[in-house]
Amino acid sequence: MILILLGPPGAGKGTQAKLLSSELGIPHISTGDMFRDHKARGTEIGKQVQAIMDAGGLVTDDITNAMVKERLSRPDVAPGFILDGYPRTVVQAEYLDGLLRSLGRSIDRALSYEVPEELVVERISGRRSCPRCGAVYHVSQNPPHRAGFCDRDDAALVQREDDKPENVRKRMQEYGTKTEPLKRYYRDRGELSDVEGVGTPEGILAVTKKVLGR
């Protein structure tokens, strides 16, 4: 089974990807993991990605597509895979379709996790992290034992600039603008299913499996 997971920041698609990977026995492939893998291996792609990120630029479609092509050449994807964070644009989706066709394959389903904006704002703006050890907390869902301080090293917790409510709303708007054409692309092909992304991870997994006929 080949699945594509879509959803705004804070929709929980990364959590669902991990649960589905375990449930279906197929690898979870995320763009972030691919970037880190290439950087760790010191590949030419990894060096290009690092140079772009150091300059504050955006990784091009060509580089991202090349990473996906390399990843899909590995034997562990034979039974299927779950893509998280790719494709992000119609251009990438068209490339992926062509790549899969060349391999005699096609996607089974694109899943779009739908979450109300205010819930996304609450999920993300409640995050707090430790600047010393990197531990991540949430003010209501996973609070530290002592409010505002890390359990591990007692450092004062901070809120990332990106996680402030006004910036989360801005990211949601950007996501909607960029992703709507992609959702339309898969919807027009009869490959898109909307999934209610509200509830416990286990509950959302149950809904996802029902959508997939599992």
UniProtKB/Swiss-Prot annotation:
Q: What class of enzyme is it?
A: transferase
Q: Which Gene3D superfamilies match?
A: P-loop containing nucleotide triphosphate hydrolases (3.40.50.300)
Q: Which residues bind ATP?
A: 10-15, 127, 136-137, 199
From the UniProt entry, list the residue stretches annotated as the region LID. Answer: 126-163
GO molecular function term, any single one:
ATP binding
Q: Name one GO biological process term.
A: AMP salvage
Pathway listed for it is: Purine metabolism; AMP biosynthesis via salvage pathway; AMP from ADP: step 1/1
The cellular location(s) given in this protein's UniProt record come to: Cytoplasm
Keyword Kinase listed: yes
Q: Does the keyword Metal-binding apply?
A: yes
Q: Which PANTHER family match?
A: NUCLEOTIDE KINASE
Entry note about domains: Consists of three domains, a large central CORE domain and two small peripheral domains, NMPbind and LID, which undergo movements during catalysis. The LID domain closes over the site of phosphoryl transfer upon ATP binding. Assembling and dissambling the active center during each catalytic cycle provides an effective means to prevent ATP hydrolysis. Some bacteria have evolved a zinc-coordinating structure that stabilizes the LID domain.
User: How would you summarize the oligomeric state and partners of this protein?
Assistant: Monomer.
State what protein this is by name. Answer: Adenylate kinase
